[in-house]
A protein has these predicted regions:
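Accessory low-complexity/Zn-finger-associated flanking regions
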Residues: 2-81, 92-93, 98-99, 114-292, ...
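Conserved SET/PR-domain catalytic core that frames the SAM/AdoMet-binding pocket
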Residues: 91-92, 97-101, 106-108, 286-323, ...
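Acidic, Ser/Thr-rich intrinsically disordered and amphipathic helical segments
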Residues: 104-112, 195, 199, 205-207, ...
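Generic preference for well-ordered alpha-helical elements
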Residues: 106-109, 122, 127, 193, ...
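C-terminal interaction modules of eukaryotic adaptor/scaffold proteins
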Residues: 445-479
Length: 479
């Protein structure tokens, strides 16, 4: 006998303006062929480029419903509280579309979004058991010193909160894309591009998806090697590799190649366009007692979700040697891939392989290891003569001191909640990846966003920086 199913509407509990989810009796499905008309009315007021709420509640504002399902065998059921803390392994969630169709998987929802030409993308839908779909945390408005540090350049507003004093962050130019005064060649004629019409859902036929997959195979990605030992086909492997429903849980150290400006696929709905479509999480810049400025999230973020990219001015090592060393990140994807050709590659974990990005942050003012070498070795006195960007051995650096995005405020933690992924969009040059940050676990509302600076303690004589992360596995020192 089939299992009984009990549906419980899931309501949110936080804030004075909770998300409205209507009762189960409304929106009953009537048999029809789904088309853009199914979402036209529900989405008429939805503006994808202006997000003012928890992004994972956006479907509710566009006519979607969300239900807690309990399945019980032996023809009986028992009602459970609709809270994520009590969900058992036999529970699930059900999304109901504006036209009344019910979906149990994100694959089904993704197909529906394509079929209806919806403004929503799959990244706004959640299928894990721990992410709470609640309105954003509200902090005391009297301590908000500035409404939006991005000055309208992001899809979201990021307020500045300081309950310790009236100080604001040091001034800088906010930008969402890396910029540079350098002149270097970017041969786009050799870039992979696609002409997909299915939002690039058929990965085995999308050249961009295949580029990511083939590069990973070429560099002996551990995940792919394991699948090959299980005799999985390329088609079976590629559908479970890299972005899954626009989330990245396992980093791809050989790089991810997103669809680009030459591709004919949809610029917003494409399943292989994520990092390029900007920040969509609700964040707040706040002042701490021990670490200066920090960044926290105002709602739960599911594991694998994209946060944003590290943005700055692109400079050479020689130029960096003359700069005030703050907010630096080294782009070293090319030498990283070269290093993986040694025979010890397979002994390294995926996480360790990704730790090729070193940063110099905020008040620390400490040059990273690569920059120390450039300080000692460079003989060039004129920054204008540093036009060696075409040198295959050159290394480039992002400087976010005077120009950057909100990511310039990320602090260090020995137990980080974000990981780094090198992504290639409008350049396939291995020296110019986009440094993207993804949630490496579920992040709770109010939690500070941190990454691991990965400094080597003792690499700088006579310099000691104690760690302030207070994590259970804290290493005690940054340097």
């Amino acid at each position: 006998m089939a299992d009984s199913i009990f549906l419980t509407p899931v309501f949110v509990s936080r804030s004075s303006s909770p998300v409205s989810i209507r009762s189960f009796s409304s929106n009953v499905h009537q048999s029809h062929q789904c088309s853009p008309h199914c979402v036209l009315t529900a989405e008429e007021n939805f503006i994808p480029d202006c997000i003012i709420q928890n992004p994972y509640t956006l479907p509710f504002s566009c006519g979607w419903k969300y239900f807690h399902i309990d399945r019980y065998a032996k023809d009986r059921f028992k009602k459970k509280p609709s809270t994520r803390k009590t969900i058992s392994s036999r529970s699930n969630y059900l999304y109901r579309s504006p036209c009344g169709r019910s979906f149990l998987t994100l694959d089904e929802i993704e197909q529906y979004l394509l079929q209806t030409n919806s403004k929503l993308t799959i990244k706004f839908f959640v299928d894990d058991r721990t992410t709470r779909l609640e309105s954003c945390i509200k902090y005391e408005s009297k301590y908000i010193l500035y409404d939006d540090i991005t000055q309208g350049k992001e899809y979201v507003r990021i307020p500045v909160y300081n309950e310790n004093n009236s100080n604001l962050p040091e001034s800088f130019i906010y930008g969402t894309e890396t910029r540079s005064k350098l002149i270097f060649s970017n041969d786009t004629t050799t870039m992979t591009c696609c002409s997909c019409t299915d939002n690039c859902r058929n990965r085995i036929k999308c050249p961009c998806w295949l580029k990511t997959f083939e590069q990973a195979k070429l560099n002996e990605n551990e995940q792919i090697l394991n699948w090959q030992r299980q005799n999985l086909s390329d088609e079976q492997m590629i559908i479970r590799f890299a972005y899954i429903h626009q989330r990245l849980k396992i980093p791809v150290w050989s790089g991810i190649y997103e669809c680009n400006s030459k591709c004919l696929c949809h610029t917003k709905q494409c399943t292989n366009r994520l990092v390029q479509n900007s920040l969509y999480q609700q964040l707040q810049l706040f002042h701490t007692n021990t670490k200066g400025w920090a960044l926290r999230v105002l709602h739960d973020i599911p594991y694998g979700s994209f946060i944003n990219a590290y943005v700055g001015e692109l400079i050479t090592e020689q130029m960096a040697a003359k700069r005030d060393f703050k907010y630096l990140a080294i782009l070293d994807h090319k030498s990283h891939l070269t290093a993986t050709n040694n025979k010890n590659r397979k002994e390294s974990s995926i996480k360790n392989k990704l730790d090729d990005v070193r940063i110099l942050h905020a008040k620390n003012r400490i040059p990273v290891k690569c920059c120390i070498r450039s300080l000692n070795d460079t003989q060039t006195d004129n920054e204008d003569d540093d036009n060696d960007e075409d040198d295959d051995d050159s290394c480039f650096i992002l400087d976010a001191k005077h120009y950057g995005s909100i990511s310039r405020f990320y602090n260090h933690s020995c137990k980080p909640n974000v990981h780094i992924q090198n992504v290639f969009i409008n350049s396939h040059n291995p020296r110019f990846p986009v440094i993207a940050l993804f949630a490496c676990r579920n992040i709770r509302a109010g939690e500070e966003i941190c990454w691991d600076y990965n400094y080597s303690v003792g690499c700088m004589p006579n310099v000691r920086i104690d760690c302030q992360c207070q994590a259970s596995n804290c290493r005690g020192r940054l340097l």
